[in-house]
């Protein structure tokens, strides 16, 4: 019998601390109150919040804009009433700018989107007290468990070797580098198959 992504997600969730629960949220949930999510982001990146990567455009603006995109989903980990981390993303549209400026250019067949081809993973974060508790792995598995896209793509800030290694363990491979927004550091684009 094969193990499904949903089965793997349940297995990982079973290994989390007893008080941690995983919850799923829609775009409407985030738009209704983006502040808890923005506060967690600002806490995680407090050491670098003045870098363009983290403040331009502001996280609240990015969250609410992304929450309106088709296929948006946010998966969160809560320890009791405390937000311990989250991952969110959405389905890339056919006119996506996600791949714009990617070097080296992987070619038109790679970057051409069609409905349901790619889910973009926009943000994965875990607050400091809950790191090294498998929450990131659980969020990743829970987010991807119900996705129907062919592949997933994520951007990892230059110098974040921990996340590059983690995504490699998730089955993602590097395809190039890109500046996601004007003035941001270079980010490594990683892509992994979902089917």
Residue ranges and their predicted role:
Residues 64-76, 92-97, 120:
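A short helix-loop-beta-strand connector motif used in the catalytic cores of GNAT acetyltransferases and
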Residues 121-126, 132-145, 168-169:
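Conserved acetyl-CoA-binding loop-helix of GNAT-fold acetyltransferases
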Residues 137-138, 151, 158-185:
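Conserved active-site alpha-helix within GNAT-family acetyltransferase domains
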